[in-house]
Amino acid sequence: MIDVMQIQKILPHRYPFLLVDKIVELKTKQIVKGYKNISISDHVFMGHFPDHPIYPGVLILEGMAQTGGVLAFESMDDKVDPSSKVVYFTGIDNAKFRNPVRPGDRLDYEMSVVKNRGNLWIFEGKAFVDGQLVAEAELKAMIVDK
C-alpha cells in the first residue's frame, strides 16, 4: 500500500487538488487500485450543488488520472526522482458517467495499462462506489521533464 504521504512524494498535487488518498494495489506496468474518501467538507460541495451535493465527473476523471500517474511513475524502468518529472494527460476518450457520487462515498479507482511505449501511456480507467461502476474512460498520458 502507498499512503497519502508517499503519494505526495510521487505526484506534485496538493490539497485541495490531490484526489487520491491511498493506493491499495499496484502491479507495475499492469494495474493500480486506489481510492478517495468523499467528504461533505470537500470544498467543491460549496458550489456543486449546495442543496444536492454531487461530486463532479471531471474530478472523478482527475482522480483516475492521478492514480494512473502513480502507476506510470512506479513502472518506469529507470527510476528517476519524481520531483524532476511530471505526468501530463494528453487525452480522454469514451468518458462515461454511470451514477452520481455523493458525500460519504468511498470512490475506488482502477487503472489498467492498455499500452505503454517509453514515456507514453494509455490506461483504461474505472471508478466504483460500493462495487458499482460510476465512471469509466480511456486516458492517455506522457511523462515529461518539468
From Swiss-Prot:
One of its GO terms (cellular component) is cytoplasm. Coiled coil: none annotated. GO terms for molecular function: (3R)-hydroxyacyl-[acyl-carrier-protein] dehydratase activity. The active site is at residue 48. Pfam families: FabA. It comes from the Bacteria. Belongs to the thioester dehydratase family. FabZ subfamily. It is an enzyme of class 4 (lyase). It is found in: Cytoplasm. This is 3-hydroxyacyl-[acyl-carrier-protein] dehydratase FabZ. It comes from Campylobacter lari (strain RM2100 / D67 / ATCC BAA-1060). Its EC number is 4.2.1.59. GO terms for biological process: fatty acid biosynthetic process; lipid A biosynthetic process. Keywords: Cytoplasm, Lipid A biosynthesis, Lipid biosynthesis, Lipid metabolism, Lyase. Involved in unsaturated fatty acids biosynthesis. Catalyzes the dehydration of short chain beta-hydroxyacyl-ACPs and long chain saturated and unsaturated beta-hydroxyacyl-ACPs. SUPFAM superfamilies: Thioesterase/thiol ester dehydrase-isomerase. It catalyses: a (3R)-hydroxyacyl-[ACP] = a (2E)-enoyl-[ACP] + H2O. The keyword Membrane does not apply.
